[in-house]
């Protein structure tokens, strides 16, 4: 069975208040072309950017799905943290007759479907974005206080035939994956889930993180977003993830680069250099290094870069001012506060745990005692 793995479409999202519907349709048209050679599509959450999606976003998704139905393709979808599970699953029972399978309201177990191909059965399991509170009510005798425990509980209480090939769609953060500032996450890594939760699945189709990447092993895959949804993602390579699942244990995964209507880029340099570049419609963050910046520089750059969304200056003066400011900030911080800043810098913005902080304070007190 061949399938296309997508996630984090975020239909209706804006980039610094700029509407991206046209850009989103451009990449979805490419997905439709790819789907002509696939058996089914899986979408691992965050179809929309907001729980109450705009009319434009819903119309775009309806067009996309309708085009795939014309191709007689099966479609499997789970909701993400940006979606409203109830809204996304509205009319889901009717849509199944059109081979569209959307995760229903959470009931404490995986929602599973079986398909057949030349190698036998394939089971596709749907796991929408869940939080511990979503699962507690279904298992009152089990202590479920972490995302890890919530997912382990759902999977262990679901009927899974490990002898067959199993695909799971999920929308969670797997420990060790790289984040960007476009994604929501919890301080201290409270939403972390270990990859071992998904042991036994032949392919784990993940959503939630925008960078296309595998975690722990090749078959635990984040498809990533098709577009760059912040300038922090400007260096990311966006891909369509195409999977060819043959007999159990034999999987080929291919990444097809996405073509953008307008790229999201950061450019920097001196005004005289940037003003003489070839005009572009890309979405740009422009940083000037000139020591003196004329009041008309921004407007003149707009003539070359009509989609310049961010404009800034970095020169010897601004760097000096920034370094002085940082020095003043750090001089007024306690050791434990400095440790938290350093830890967050090294761990994708995650906070140290209470146990780690207690250990640090213990060491600080020991050092103070030795110095007295």
Where are these regions (language model features)?
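N-terminal active-site segment of His-dependent metallophosphoesterases
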Residues: 1-65, 355, 359-366, 370-371
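Divalent metal-coordination and catalytic microenvironments
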Residues: 8, 28, 46, 61, ...
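Short, conserved loop/helix-junction motifs that constitute active-site signature segments
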Residues: 69-71, 160-162, 196-200, 277-279, ...
């Amino acid at each position: 069975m061949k399938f296309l793995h997508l996630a984090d479409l975020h239909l209706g999202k804006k980039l610094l208040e700029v509407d991206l519907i046209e850009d989103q349709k451009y990449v979805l048209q490419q997905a439709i072309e790819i789907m002509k050679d696939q058996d089914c599509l899986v979408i691992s959450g965050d179809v929309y950017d907001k729980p109450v999606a705009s009319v434009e976003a819903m119309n775009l998704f309806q067009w996309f799905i309708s085009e795939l139905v014309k191709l007689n393709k099966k479609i499997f979808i789970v909701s993400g943290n940006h979606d409203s599970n109830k809204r996304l699953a509205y009319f889901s029972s009717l849509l199944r007759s059109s081979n569209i399978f959307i995760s229903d309201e959470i009931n404490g177990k995986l929602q599973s479907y079986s398909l057949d191909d030349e190698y036998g059965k394939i089971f596709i399991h749907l796991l929408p974005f869940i939080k511990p509170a979503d699962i507690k009510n279904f298992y009152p005798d089990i202590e479920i206080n972490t995302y890890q425990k919530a997912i382990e509980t759902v999977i262990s209480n679901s009927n899974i035939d490990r002898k067959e090939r199993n695909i799971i769609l999920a929308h969670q953060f797997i420990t060790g994956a790289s984040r960007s500032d476009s994604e929501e996450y919890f301080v201290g890594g409270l939403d972390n889930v270990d990859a071992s939760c998904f042991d036994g699945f032949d392919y784990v189709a993940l959503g939630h993180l925008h960078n296309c990447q595998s975690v722990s092993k090749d078959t635990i895959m984040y498809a990533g977003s098709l577009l760059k949804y912040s300038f922090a993602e400007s260096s990311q390579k966006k891909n369509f993830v195409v999977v060819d699942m043959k007999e159990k244990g034999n999987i080929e995964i291919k990444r097809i680069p996405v073509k953008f209507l307008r790229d999201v880029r950061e450019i920097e340099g001196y005004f005289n250099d940037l003003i003489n570049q070839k005009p572009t419609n890309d979405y740009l963050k422009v940083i000037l290094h000139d020591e003196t910046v004329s009041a008309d520089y921004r407007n003149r750059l707009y003539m070359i870069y009509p989609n310049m969304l961010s404009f800034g200056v970095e020169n010897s003066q601004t760097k000096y001012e920034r370094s002085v400011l940082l020095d003043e900030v750090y001089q007024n911080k306690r050791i434990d506060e400095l440790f938290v800043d350093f830890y967050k810098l090294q761990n994708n913005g995650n906070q140290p745990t209470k146990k780690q902080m207690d250990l640090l304070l213990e060491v600080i007190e020991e050092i103070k005692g030795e110095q007295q």
